[in-house]
Curated annotation (Swiss-Prot):
GO BP term, example: synapse assembly
Alphabetical list of SMART domains matching this protein: PlsC
Pathway: Membrane lipid metabolism; glycerophospholipid metabolism
Subunit and partners: Part of a heterotrimeric complex composed of GNPAT, AGPS and a modified form of GNPAT.
Reaction catalyzed: dihydroxyacetone phosphate + an acyl-CoA = a 1-acylglycerone 3-phosphate + CoA; dihydroxyacetone phosphate + hexadecanoyl-CoA = 1-hexadecanoylglycerone 3-phosphate + CoA
Family: Belongs to the GPAT/DAPAT family.
Domain-level remarks: The HXXXXD motif is essential for acyltransferase activity and may constitute the binding site for the phosphate moiety of the glycerol-3-phosphate.
Annotated protein name in UniProt: Dihydroxyacetone phosphate acyltransferase
Tissue specificity note: Highly expressed in liver and testis. Lower levels in heart, brain, lung and kidney. Detected in spleen.
């Protein structure tokens, strides 16, 4: 068993306002004990495991059917027939032609779930996981709750997404516990992997195009296919809210398409309820860490192919530490909607007629998506390496070993006070914990003569697209640091606001916090419309860490809080500086541009500053950060987005760009938000 440690540090609550304490004073969470799935696998034949008696519990309202039956149900559904007739009238295309096209679409996307393929993957994955992972740890209580949930109502699994193996890992875990293997929404990229794509189909994967390009028939067939599986209770439906893997290891803002689809049967009263299960998958060491660094530096992602998969066999000789998979409590969609949503509008027209979602429903779907992601973040397990690398990145990339251990222990205490789920082995000395973390990540750090140094060659001397290995190594390290930012976001933004605000009046600090939260709302997960509560949570956590106190309408900083506030400000410094740097790029380089041109030119501009030594902000090289900044610039009016000849073009608003750059640099005061109420 692997049990997360309880906090050894004790911080008093300080003097946060009673409302803040009421809202955010959470009981110390009693984390479930984790079971290592691989422990039993190491003592029992993999073949015996794969061929075990597999009798998963079934949904009580299940409609028994085979994969082929689902396709027949979809093609004969009232909704598909209605859409085909509508399109036939609009395009003057024969109904039979459109029906054949719908059948081809179904053939392209549909799964062919078979127990034989599941057993094959169970055998192969058991061997691979034992080879590359020390442990695969799962919270048993979460599994027990899921076991009950799949029998009561349709279930939607919502895992975090950090690696290609996320969905394989989940299917392996569910098979191990005799739970129904899910049907999984996968990208069309995998279809290039011939034999592998067929195996994935037979293990439950169904394939969707990245964009539907306004293809009404494709959208109708795809959505009806997913809804049919959900209504029939065929199997749990699994997809990633983020839509794609996060290359920078921060949770990406949610995509709403699939979520809309799986919620619709409830909206139309076709099912009584639907359970959402947020799942948090945490890796000690990410398999694709170097690949991600190259991708966010502009190197194209390798095309998925069987040949590429075979070349990836080299990872079988590496150690990737442990994986922790936390199954959150099933969340009832009916409970979320109670008193929040009026479903009567769906009764006014026949179910088969597609409807445009009312604004209140759109807002509700958005709220549910962000809430599920916040639950994922809450249950992500944090390894000691995240603390170690964060300290090193703030200390000139090298430190005395004893000083590093001391600072890591300090950060451990702060992390636990902020509610981080930290996996720190209590049966080891701190020095051993830090040393074993460095050893696991020996491609990024080394211990030489009592000095810990981050390696700046990342095991490669290759220069790609003019990028030097140092940038690759730094971005690999940043990806681990970024995992801490999920739980540090709110107190860090308050700390930044305190640093940027002249005087410490609560109202002024809140205004600055609101501005920063708006600027960085594409970088981190914030529930829309929750600004005041986020501010109160950040203040409460800083009071809890004894970094500050509330005194009426003022904030008082404590002597003990200097280290905490300096650390938090430094933690977010790369994002503030990157956005400033990108503002300068817009002012000096471009009047208008397309997104692809922007990414290439912004990276070139940043690289020149790094080469000249006039900036050390290597985070600005990241395409993920550049895309997030562009989305923020559009929202803030720094650039205007227009569609020209079916392509989007961005026009720079010079004065607004200058103003934002000055506000981030504390050269211009931040105005009060119109809706600020404290």
């Amino acid at each position: 068993m692997d049990v997360p440690s309880s906090s050894s540090s004790r911080f008093s609550v300080g003097s946060a306002s009673p409302s803040s304490v009421l809202l955010y004073a959470k009981d110390l969470k009693k984390w479930d004990e984790f079971e290592d799935l691989l422990e039993e696998r190491r003592h029992i034949s993999d073949f015996k495991f794969a061929m075990k008696c597999y009798t998963p519990p079934l949904y009580r309202g299940i409609t028994p059917c085979k994969p082929g039956d689902i396709k027949s149900i979809v093609l004969s559904s009232e909704e598909i027939n209605y859409v085909i007739k509508q399109l036939s009238r609009e395009s003057l295309t024969g109904v039979d032609v459109l029906r054949e096209e719908a059948s081809e679409i179904l053939e392209e996307m549909s799964h062919k779930l078979r127990i034989g393929a599941i057993r094959f993957f169970a055998f192969v994955l058991s061997k691979i996981f034992k080879q590359i992972f020390s442990k695969v740890c799962v919270n048993e209580e979460g599994i027990q709750k899921l076991q009950r949930a799949v029998q009561e109502h349709p279930v939607v699994l919502l895992p975090s997404h950090r690696s290609y193996i996320d969905f394989l890992m989940l299917s392996f875990i569910l098979y191990s516990y005799d739970l129904p293997v899910p049907v999984i929404a996968a990208g069309m990229d995998f279809l290039g992997m011939r034999v592998v794509s067929e195996l994935l189909r037979m293990s439950g994967a169904f394939f969707m195009r990245r964009t539907f390009g306004g293809n009404k028939l494709y959208w109708a067939v795809f959505s009806e296919y997913v809804k049919t599986m959900l209504r029939c209770g065929y199997a749990p439906v699994e997809f990633f809210l983020e839509g794609t893997r996060s290359r920078a290891a921060k949770t990406l803002t949610p995509k709403f398409g699939l979520l809309n689809i799986v919620m619709e049967p409830f909206f139309k009263r076709e099912v009584f309820d639907t359970y959402f299960v947020p799942i948090s998958i945490s890796y000690d060491k990410i398999l694709e860490e170097s690949l991600y660094a190259y991708e966010i530096l502009g190197v194209p992602k390798p095309k998925e192919s069987t040949t590429g998969l075979l070349k990836a066999r080299r990872i079988l000789s590496e150690n990737f530490g442990s994986i922790h998979v936390y199954f959150g409590d099933p969340v009832s969609l009916r409970s979320l909607a109670a008193g929040r949503l009026n479903r009567n509008t769906y009764n006014l027209v026949p179910r088969c007629i597609p409807q445009k979602q009312p604004e209140d429903v759109q807002a509700f779907v958005t709220e549910v998506a962000y809430k599920m992601q916040l639950l994922q973040i809450e249950n992500l397990a944090l390894s000691p390496w995240l603390l170690v690398v964060t300290i090193l990145l703030q200390n000139q990339l090298s430190m005395d070993f004893d000083a590093l251990v001391e600072k890591t222990l300090w950060l451990k205490g702060v992390t636990q006070v902020f509610g981080g789920f930290l996996l720190w082995p209590d049966n080891k000395l701190p020095e051993e914990v830090v040393q074993s973390s460095i050893l696991l990540h020996s491609n990024l750090a080394s211990l030489v003569k009592d000095q810990v140094v981050l390696k700046m060659n990342s095991g490669s001397s290759q220069v790609v697209n003019g990028l030097v290995p140092e940038h690759i190594a730094l971005l690999m390290c940043s990806a681990y640091r970024n995992q801490l930012l999920n739980i540090f976001a709110r107190p860090s933004l308050v700390a930044l606001a305190l640093h940027m605000t002249p005087g410490l009046r609560k109202e002024d600090v809140f205004s600055c916090f609101s501005f920063l939260r708006n600027v960085f709302s594409d970088e981190f997960i914030f529930l829309p419309g929750n600004t005041l509560r986020d501010f109160e949570e950040g203040c409460y956590l800083l009071c809890k860490a004894e970094a500050m106190q509330m005194a009426g309408k003022d904030i008082i900083l404590t002597d003990k809080g200097t280290a905490v506030l300096q650390f938090l400000t430094s933690l977010f410094k790369p994002f503030v500086e990157s956005y400033q740097l990108l503002c300068r790029y817009l002012l000096h380089e471009e009047d208008y541009f397309g997104e692809k041109e922007y990414l290439v030119a912004a990276r070139k501009f940043t690289r020149q500053l790094l080469d000249q030594g006039s900036s050390q902000c290597y985070d600005a090289l990241s395409s993920e950060l550049q895309k997030n900044a562009l989305a923020a610039f559009v929202r803030l009016g720094v650039v205007e987005k227009k569609k020209v000849d079916s392509k989007y073009v961005y026009y720079v608003n010079g004065p607004a760009t200058s103003k934002l750059e000055e506000m981030l640099g504390c050269k211009k005061p931040i105005g009060k938000p119109a809706t600020a109420k404290l």
